[in-house]
Amino acid sequence: MSRRAKKDDFLRHYTVSDPRTHPKGYTEYKVTAQFISKKDPEDIKEVVVWKRYSDFRKLHGDLAYTHRNLFRRLEEFPAFPRAQVFGRFEASVIEERRKGAEDLLRFTVPIPALNNSPQLKEFFRGGEVTRPSEVSRDLQILPPPLIPTPPSDEARLLQPLPAERRGQEELEVPVDPLPSSPAQEALDLLFCCDSTEEASSSPARGPLSEAELALFDPYSKEESTGPSPTHTSELAAMEVQSKRLDQEPWEPGGREEEEAEDGDPAPAYLGQATELITQALRNEKAGAYAAALQGYQEGVHILLQGVSGDPSPTRREGVKKKAAEYLKRAETLHAHLP
């Protein structure tokens, strides 16, 4: 089963409720994630964790970074309440933070790159995957209360000495159990992000997935079936191609098709993007990966802004394909950055 199919298995619903004061003095909130099967609406899985304001603020920063790299302009990323020292225990502030956290989680629902991100899965780490019906059943079937009975004389003789009892208590100090493997697997099934992607990148700066790149390149699935060239040969090919971008149109049909369609020269945004991307290719070849990454991002940003107003349908298609190629190239640079 493909990753795309896995992502579409569940409908998601998030709630943030029941604020309470932790014994250490800060406020924490109950976060409930419900995963409703599309095949069987009665099949509902639930994950509950307790989080504080700083946890939500970190998640907000991580997801905002990912959202910016998606170049989505149709929706505005939700703001989050600012940190404050005074008044943070007031009911109005607690409610504002609760609602801000809930809005953040619900914003991720229609965006696969966010709701299946490693950052969101890490946020729910430690929560046990349960079914609401099982929880209610467990609450109804409670064991009978334990009634203490006075120990018999025989039991009193078998009791350990105080020193032995102290030693036994020291050995029986409870420790927090490590997350079990089945629990980890259950969480992984709900958040279908690639584990190798998590290991190769930091949680806050994960690379974009193939599904996200497909937003810009409708032919990405067809092209991905062939063997990929080596890093060196691909760089050389892209550099030669970029040198011709200001001379040839960014469309499959060539210059004759462009001139026959509208008779106008290539728009200015293509020249600006060409200059940035050409320099980015040179920086990458020289090993200046940070500068190259910035150049790719700025170049792709100009392309996607300009293509929305481009009157040529064929050129728009070509620009989207080029933007996807250079965006994918930018993502490979994450492996070289410290």
Curated annotation (Swiss-Prot):
Modified residues (Omega-N-methylarginine): R106
Superkingdom in the source lineage: Eukaryota
Membrane topology summary: Peripheral membrane protein
InterPro entries listed in its UniProt record: Intracell_Sig-Traffick_Protein, MIT_dom, MIT_dom_sf, PX_dom, PX_dom_sf
All residue ranges annotated as the PX domain in the record: 1-131
Keywords annotated in UniProt: Cytoplasm, Cytoplasmic vesicle, Lipid-binding, Membrane, Methylation, Phosphoprotein, Protein transport, Transport
GO cellular component: cytoplasmic vesicle membrane
Disordered: annotated segments: 134-155, 240-270
Quaternary structure and interacting proteins, as annotated: Homodimer. Interacts with SNX1, SNX2 and SNX4.
Free-text comment about domains: The PX domain mediates interaction with membranes enriched in phosphatidylinositol 3-phosphate.
Similarity section: Belongs to the sorting nexin family.
Main function: May be involved in several stages of intracellular trafficking. Overexpression of SNX15 disrupts the normal trafficking of proteins from the plasma membrane to recycling endosomes or the TGN.
Protein name, UniProt field: Sorting nexin-15
Gene designation: Snx15
